[in-house]
Each structure stands twice: as structure tokens, then as C-alpha cells.
Amino acid sequence: MTTYPVPQNPLLLRVLRLMDAFSKSDDERDFYVDRVEGFILYIDLDKDQEDLDKVYQELEENADRYCLIPKLTFYEIKKIMETFVNEKIYDIDTKEKFLEIVQSKNAREQFLEFLYDHETEQEKWQQFYVERSRIRIIEWLRNNKFQFVFEEDLDFSKHVLEQLKVHLFDAKVSKELTQARQLLVNKSKVYYSNEALNPRPKRGRPPKQSAKVEAETTVSSDIYTKVPSAARRFLFLPEITSASSLTFSEKFDTEEEFLAHLRGGGRLEDQLNLAKFSERFDSLRELSAKLGYDGDGDASDFFGEEYDDDDDDDDDVKPKKAAKRGRKKARS
């Protein structure tokens, strides 16, 4: 059995990065969490086959070092959406529409698209999704016996966090790092408490509604000293400093990409509607010509009096064009 270096304090993990990996883990994408340093591997099948062979060999030979992040099943995805709708949406018509979407094909993407048309529900979803994802991740880490602390939960300076990573396997460190390690040990115990999986609701009157301002989390640099050479090209290192950057979508990697898709989809829909309207208008003009309401006829009899102004404008324009042609002939 392989012997690995022993970390001298709980692993510093990024919960937002874990949320991203958990949401993307599916039948085509594998993510692993390292037990030694806490880094995440994303087995990208688009990499060179030689690199893939090496990393698969590393995973096989050191299977006890890496934990495969579980896949989100169809049932779990549906359950997440249903729970949100039943617990957080109060308008009956809106709730019925959401539940109808949940039962449809491609429910995950349709759910998000409909959600972004309802700003109030969107904010509630963001909070719900982050809270439920956090609980799911903590439960999984506990089941796999990780001793950890989420870096986003700490109030340490960036310098101290980076020094803790640099000296993760050093028994003797400075007094400052010794104190920081003790704080990490105490903090790590909180994640194994009952409250970590069952957060207590805040008591008292809810605060007044105000403009929502989300502060980005300050995180330290990624410092890993024990990454096997075969795994280095597969490190999963997205810079996620805000929960609003996360997305529940299975097709898009970031919230920005999903929103860009929605905006693009809106423009495409407008273009299609405009094309349909243009085709119908052309059909009406052809029909009017067949019925005798051509350019010399009185189009107002066919289209109605509301088009009189437009026809007058056309009549005003046509003589001008004729006059121009007349002048050209005169010059010749």
C-alpha cells in the first residue's frame, strides 16, 4: 500500500469550486478530489490520449488517494427543482407553470430559462441552490472522512492562507502558523456537527428589502506541492469568487455563458417573428394584386382607411422619382 505525506492541518478547500464540479459531474465528465492536498482533477476527454492514459494509470495505481465526485442523477435533478418550487414559490399560477416544466423534456434548461423571466424567484433560487449544494458537499466530505475547512468561511489574510498551503506537510512552523492551524482544527469540527447539515433558520423579523450587493470572496493562490506529474494537466482551477457565477445548467459552464445564450435566443426569436410577419405581408400584397388592388388601384378599399396616410406618402414619393428620371432624359 502506498504511503502518502500527512497534512499537518485540515485541508483548505474552496466550496464554490466544489459546487461547480458537483453540478458538472455527469456521465461524460469525471471529477476527483485528492485526499492528500485537496486539489480537484477534471478528466477532460478532449486531452491527448497519451495524457489520458497516464492519468488513468495514476488513478488506478493510487485509487485510495482520489475520491470520485458523485454524478447528479435524473431523479436528483428533478428532486432539487421540485423541492424549490414547493418550498419557495407561493404564486399558484407560477408554481403550476414551474411544476409543468419540471415534468417536461429538457426540464433543467427550461426551468432555468423560465426562472430568469422571474427576478424574484431567481434570487430565491440562487440562495436555495447554494445552501442545498453546500449541505450535499459537506455530507459527501464527511462520508469520505475528509478533515477540511472551506477557505471562503475563513477570515485569514491571504498571506497566512498561502503560508499554510506552502507548509502543509511541515511539522515545525512559525508561531503565527501554529495558531492558525489550531483555529483550523477548531473550525473543521463545525462541519461535523448536526447544524452543518441542518442549518437553523434565522429568527426575528426579516430585514427590509434593499438592493442586493454581493461581495466577492477573497481567496488565496492555488499552491499544491504534491501533484503527480501525470495529473498536472487535469487540475480543475476555475476562479470562482462569487456564488452568482455558478450555474445549474448542464450545457453552459458559467452564468455569463448561460445569460449570453438567453440574450442570443431572444434576438433569434425576434428575427424569426419578423420574418414570419414579412412573409404574411407579402402574401397580402400578392392577394391584393390578384383582386385588382394593384399599384394603380385604390389600396385603401382593401386595407382600410388606416392606410390612407401611408398611401398618400407613397404617392408623394413616386412623382419625385419620375421627375428625376425625366431630368436625366432631358440632359441626354
Swiss-Prot record:
Transmembrane segments: none annotated. Residues 320-332 have a biased composition (Basic residues). InterPro entries: UPF0158. Residues 295-316 have a biased composition (Acidic residues). Pfam families: UPF0158 (PF03682). Residues 196-215, 291-332 are annotated as: Disordered. Belongs to the UPF0158 family. This is UPF0158 protein TC_0713. It comes from Chlamydia muridarum (strain MoPn / Nigg).
